[in-house]
């Protein structure tokens, strides 16, 4: 049988044309050192900063330090199985988290994996955890109120949708309670809330979730938790995961509230990672870019322009101070980034003034333009009343001979402090806040004994619901003060039936 050269060459040509290369080109490096949640790898010359890499056992890592001879990687998972000499490969992707409606009502970790035992989350949408903040032209001035339901905040330091308002105070001063009450008050406000717990005890997070569930707030809330037992990389990533989940809603024209509880622990986790990566330490051993850590997170909160859908993302970051020292490094950084701060004083808290908001040092730089007209009219003199009361209170302890004007200021101040007190998880609708503050600032409470103010308030709200519902509805819909005569008639009508205690 003769074999013709033409046939052979034709067959070879055909084989070459039909040949499909199955070679996969990937950048592979070798682990040269591992420990404390950090790995160093050699050979990943083309890896990008912030890129995901995959270890041989399937655990992912984040390339952070790009050095001359090696790459510093933070490991996002258990690192005990990773050994020196193991293979590590580039993925070509940056870290993303699952987003979308499916996460609402769930408790997830910073990687978007459910930790509440309610099964998998079926969403196909993801967003990168690091994304640029909206530009100047994509934004709009803050002008819509975010009602917290807390009289002291809505009257003195109002918050608008799209604002960043810092909540700062020592441990055990009621910071989490302020945020929870704010979330509970969003029930019928068409808001999606995201509570990010950073470095909290798991029992604390459990209590928060149960509180939200009990009050029906979990149906519009996502809880992101990186508890104290988690490795530092997850604590560092948790706030970025939370804001990415919120951005998905904001860019679709919805309103979002994100609570970061608290950023001090995130900064400590980032300091730990930076020192392990051998980055040079600065003040208080924090790395040089710790300001950027928080600024790039909080700048992603915005009120979007109408062209971008008009959505908003409001941020409530927490900072824990040591012995009330707001001039430490992290507190001053975050104060300078945010649009105001609510300062919680431990002295006030332990003296029974709760929420323990210090009206003198708390400010809201942009919330005033978002406050409803009715509230700005009734709360105009509150800050001055409180400030003069605190000043005179110190003098009044030394002498009893006070003139009538001073005594009147002290009496009004004592009643103001009582009215601004509020029970735990009892947020108040804004129309009822306006009614009680009107009664306070216009002198209707001056003849009510201080000890009876709390009872007066509770009975007044119940009386308004049954006897002056139209007045409450008018404030709610017009957002303006009704006729003075209507207010006076309602308040005097209740005072006639109110019985002071002996």
From Swiss-Prot:
Where in the cell?
Cell membrane
Q: Which SUPFAM superfamilies match?
A: C-terminal domain of alpha and beta subunits of F1 ATP synthase, N-terminal domain of alpha and beta subunits of F1 ATP synthase, P-loop containing nucleoside triphosphate hydrolases
Task: Supply the CDD domains for this chain.
Answer: ATP-synt_F1_alpha_C, ATP-synt_F1_alpha_N, F1-ATPase_alpha_CD
> Which parts pass through the membrane?
none
Q: Quick one: signal sequence residues?
A: none
Tell me what topology the record assigns in the membrane.
Answer: Peripheral membrane protein
List the residue ranges of the region (Disordered): 115-136
Reaction(s) catalysed (UniProt annotation) = ATP + H2O + 4 H(+)(in) = ADP + phosphate + 5 H(+)(out)
| Family annotation (Pfam families) | ATP-synt_ab, ATP-synt_ab_C, ATP-synt_ab_N
Could you list this entry's UniProt keywords, alphabetically sorted: ATP synthesis, ATP-binding, Cell membrane, CF(1), Hydrogen ion transport, Ion transport, Membrane, Nucleotide-binding, Translocase, Transport
GO cellular component terms, A-Z? plasma membrane; proton-transporting ATP synthase complex
Q: Does the keyword Zinc apply?
A: no
MF terms in GO: ADP binding; ATP binding; proton-transporting ATP synthase activity, rotational mechanism
> Per the UniProt record, which EC number(s) apply here?
7.1.2.2
Binding residues for ATP, per the UniProt record? 169-176
Uppermost EC category: translocase
Superkingdom classification of source = Bacteria
Which residues are tagged with the site Required for activity? 362
Q: What does this protein do?
A: Produces ATP from ADP in the presence of a proton gradient across the membrane. The alpha chain is a regulatory subunit.
Q: How does it assemble?
A: F-type ATPases have 2 components, CF(1) - the catalytic core - and CF(0) - the membrane proton channel. CF(1) has five subunits: alpha(3), beta(3), gamma(1), delta(1), epsilon(1). CF(0) has three main subunits: a(1), b(2) and c(9-12). The alpha and beta chains form an alternating ring which encloses part of the gamma chain. CF(1) is attached to CF(0) by a central stalk formed by the gamma and epsilon chains, while a peripheral stalk is formed by the delta and b chains.
Member of which family?
Answer: Belongs to the ATPase alpha/beta chains family.
Put simply, this protein is called ATP synthase subunit alpha
Task: Provide the species name.
Answer: Bacillus cytotoxicus (strain DSM 22905 / CIP 110041 / 391-98 / NVH 391-98)
């Amino acid at each position: 049988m003769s074999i013709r050269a033409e046939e052979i060459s034709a067959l070879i040509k055909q084989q070459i044309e039909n040949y499909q290369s199955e070679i996969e080109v990937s950048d592979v490096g070798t682990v040269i050192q591992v420990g404390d949640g950090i790995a160093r790898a050699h050979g990943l010359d083309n890896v990008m900063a912030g890129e995901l890499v995959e270890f041989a056992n399937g655990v992912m890592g984040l390339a952070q330090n790009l050095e001359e001879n090696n790459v510093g990687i933070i490991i996002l998972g258990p690192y005990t199985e990773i050994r020196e000499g193991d293979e590590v490969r580039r993925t070509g992707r940056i870290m993303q988290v699952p987003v979308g409606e499916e996460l609402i009502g769930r408790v997830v970790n910073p990687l978007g994996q459910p930790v509440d035992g309610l099964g998998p989350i079926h969403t196909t949408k993801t967003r990168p955890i690091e994304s640029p903040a909206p530009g100047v032209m994509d934004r709009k001035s803050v002008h819509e109120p975010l009602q917290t339901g807390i009289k002291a905040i809505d009257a003195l330091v109002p918050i608008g949708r799209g604002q960043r308002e810092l909540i700062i105070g020592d441990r055990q001063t009621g910071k989490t309670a302020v945020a929870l009450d704010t979330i509970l008050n969003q029930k019928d406000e068409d808001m999606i809330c995201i509570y990010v717990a950073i470095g909290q005890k798991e029992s604390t997070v459990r209590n928060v979730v149960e509180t939200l569930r009990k009050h029906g707030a979990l149906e519009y809330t996502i809880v992101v938790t990186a508890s104290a037992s988690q490795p530092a990389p997850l604590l560092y990533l948790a706030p970025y995961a939370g804001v990415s989940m919120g951005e998905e809603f904001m860019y679709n024209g919805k309103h979002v509230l994100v609570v970061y509880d608290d950023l001090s622990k995130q900064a400590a986790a980032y300091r730990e990672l930076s020192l392990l990566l051998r980055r040079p330490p600065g003040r208080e051993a924090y790395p040089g870019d710790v300001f950027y850590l928080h600024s790039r997170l909080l700048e992603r909160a915005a009120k979007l322009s109408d062209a971008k859908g008009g959505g908003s993302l409001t941020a409530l970051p927490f900072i824990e101070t040591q012995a009330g020292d707001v001039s430490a490094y992290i507190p001053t950084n975050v104060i300078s980034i945010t649009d105001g701060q609510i300062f919680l004083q431990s002295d006030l808290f332990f003296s029974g003034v709760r929420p323990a908001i210090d009206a003198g040092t708390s400010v809201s730089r942009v919330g005033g333009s978002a406050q409803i007209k009715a509230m700005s009219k009734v709360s105009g003199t509150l800050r001055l009343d409180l400030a003069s009361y605190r000043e005179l209170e110190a003098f009044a302890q030394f002498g009893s001979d006070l003139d009538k004007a001073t005594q009147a200021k002290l009496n009004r101040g004592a009643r103001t402090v009582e009215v601004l007190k509020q029970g735990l998880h009892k947020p108040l609708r804004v129309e009822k806040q306006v009614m009680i503050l009107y009664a306070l600032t216009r002198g209707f409470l001056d003849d009510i004994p201080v000890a009876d103010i709390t009872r007066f308030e509770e009975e007044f709200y119940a009386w308004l619901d049954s006897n002056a519902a139209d007045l409450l509805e008018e404030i709610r819909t017009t957002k303006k003060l009704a006729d003075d005569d209507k207010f006076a008639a309602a308040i005097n009508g209740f005072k006639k039936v109110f019985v002071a205690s002996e």
